[in-house]
């Protein structure tokens, strides 16, 4: 069967759910697809199909990142359901990087929890510009004052991490009611319609970096029998067209290849634009020649490097960071785009150690070369937790 062409008439935005485990992120994602399907005819995705990695069902927590799509009156949304469990922050970092705006889901029963804070912090680190709040499970809260208290706590938390907490839009509702087609006290379907309207009005259409040379971090690699190797990811900048020559950069020798096909949501495209999640079919490339964490680029635009200078913020103990200082030779993991890689830190001449809560310049040497450039942001991780965030200020010749 021939694949349908992708409809470009509506403005395209990337959003996603963030928040504490079991506060209802996946239920809300399913409710958004259901209400949008009823109103605008897009595909309805049941809860089970979004919460779809096998180990999730046993423990009731979302591990992998699910992509769904839905529409509002004026926009087309690609929605990432981000993992909520602290153990899966690594996925959160790659997921949250794909958002023009985030929907923070917080249970009205429990209020903000440790991962609520951690996800807001991560959203700030990876540059999510806008957060909309969905105060879920409001049908289980009879005391209006309690709702107001939770709302106030969330606003204070957002302000603490440099979001505009006072003016953040907060929708009070119940995703489960909406999923069951109920609307008690306008907390069900009505709250989802309101959320769609608020997404439309409050998530700014980003200036897609279309004029810059093409770059796409590789998230996943598949072999398609009889066709070749497909890599998937979100185009960070530029435009890619079938027939164009590109390079695969990072970890190994740079490889040149030709794009022979582009797809989005199982529909074929002639070209892919910045901001879109696509699959790209590559000519004469074997599955084992490509891996997650490499990038596709317009030929000759980026060289791989291992050394750089960066400005970093090291989280304080209170923010969930390290409890002790680190010294020259510290070797944490650096998370760039879709890859994590160990790096060795050197300190400026006048600094002997870095304390939790410090803002400092570091000179870093990565253990393998990857595609990096000035302005690239990253997270610093150690022992399963985020300990810092940074931005590259200068790439050094190796």
UniProtKB/Swiss-Prot annotation:
Residue intervals of the tr-type G domain: 10-207
Alphabetically ordered keywords of this record: Cytoplasm, Elongation factor, GTP-binding, Hydrolase, Magnesium, Metal-binding, Nucleotide-binding, Protein biosynthesis
One Pfam family named in its UniProt record: GTP_EFTU
Catalytic reactions of this protein: GTP + H2O = GDP + phosphate + H(+)
Stretches the record annotates as G3: 81-84
Any one Gene Ontology cellular component term annotated for this protein: cytosol
Compartments (UniProt record): Cytoplasm
Stretches the record annotates as G4: 136-139
EC number: 3.6.5.3
Single Gene Ontology MF annotation: GTPase activity
Region (G1): 19-26
SUPFAM superfamilies, per database record: EF-Tu/eEF-1alpha/eIF2-gamma C-terminal domain, P-loop containing nucleoside triphosphate hydrolases, Translation proteins
Recorded coiled-coil stretches: none
Binding, Mg(2+): 26
Region (G2): 60-64
Positions with a binding annotation for GTP: 19-26, 81-85, 136-139
Region (G5): 174-176
Disulfide-linked positions: none
Protein family per UniProt: Belongs to the TRAFAC class translation factor GTPase superfamily. Classic translation factor GTPase family. EF-Tu/EF-1A subfamily.
Subunit structure, as described in the record: Monomer.
Function: GTP hydrolase that promotes the GTP-dependent binding of aminoacyl-tRNA to the A-site of ribosomes during protein biosynthesis.
UniProt protein name: Elongation factor Tu
UniProt organism field: Carsonella ruddii (strain PV)
Lineage of the organism: Bacteria, Pseudomonadati, Pseudomonadota, Gammaproteobacteria, Oceanospirillales
Chain's gene name: tuf
């Amino acid at each position: 069967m021939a694949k349908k062409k992708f409809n470009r008439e509506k403005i395209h935005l990337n959003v996603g759910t963030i928040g504490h485990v079991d506060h209802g992120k996946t239920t809300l994602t399913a409710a958004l697809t259901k209400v949008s399907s009823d109103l605008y005819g897009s595909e309805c995705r049941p809860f089970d199909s979004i919460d779809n990695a096998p180990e999730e069902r046993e423990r009731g927590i979302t591990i992998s990142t699910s992509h769904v799509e839905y529409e509002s009156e004026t926009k087309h949304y690609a929605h990432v359901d981000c993992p909520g469990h602290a153990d899966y922050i690594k996925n959160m970092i790659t997921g949250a990087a794909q958002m023009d705006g985030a929907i923070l889901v917080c249970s009205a029963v429990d209020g903000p929890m440790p991962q609520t804070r951690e996800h807001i912090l991560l959203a700030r680190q990876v540059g999510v510009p806008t957060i909309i709040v969905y105060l879920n499970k409001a049908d289980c809260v009879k005391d209006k004052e309690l709702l107001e208290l939770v709302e106030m706590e969330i606003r204070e938390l957002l302000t603490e991490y440099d979001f505009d907490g006072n003016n953040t839009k907060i929708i009070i509702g119940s995703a489960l009611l909406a999923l069951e087609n109920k609307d008690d006290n306008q907390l069900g379907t009505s709250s989802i319609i309101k959320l769609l309207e608020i997404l439309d009005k409050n998530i700014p259409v980003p200036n897609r970096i279309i004029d810059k040379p093409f770059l796409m971090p590789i998230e996943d690699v598949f072999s398609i029998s009889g066709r070749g190797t497909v890599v998937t990811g979100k185009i960070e900048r530029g435009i890619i067209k079938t027939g164009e020559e590109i390079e695969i950069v990072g970890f190994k020798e740079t490889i040149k290849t030709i794009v022979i096909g582009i797809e989005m949501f199982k529909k074929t495209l002639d070209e892919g634009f910045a901001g879109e999640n696509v699959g790209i079919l590559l000519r004469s490339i074997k599955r084992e020649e490509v891996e997650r964490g490499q990038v596709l680029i317009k030929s000759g635009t980026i060289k791989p490097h291992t050394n750089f200078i960066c400005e970093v913020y090291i989280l304080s103990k209170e923010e969930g960071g390290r409890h002790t200082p680190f010294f020259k030779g510290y070797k944490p993991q650096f998370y760039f785009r879709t890859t994590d890689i160990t790096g060795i830190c050197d300190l400026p001449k006048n600094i002997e150690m870095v304390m939790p809560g410090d803002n400092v310049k570091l000179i870093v040497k990565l253990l393998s070369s990857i595609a990096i450039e000035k302005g690239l942001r990253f997270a610093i991780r150690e022992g399963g937790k985020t300990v810092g965030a940074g931005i590259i200020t200068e790439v050094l010749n190796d």
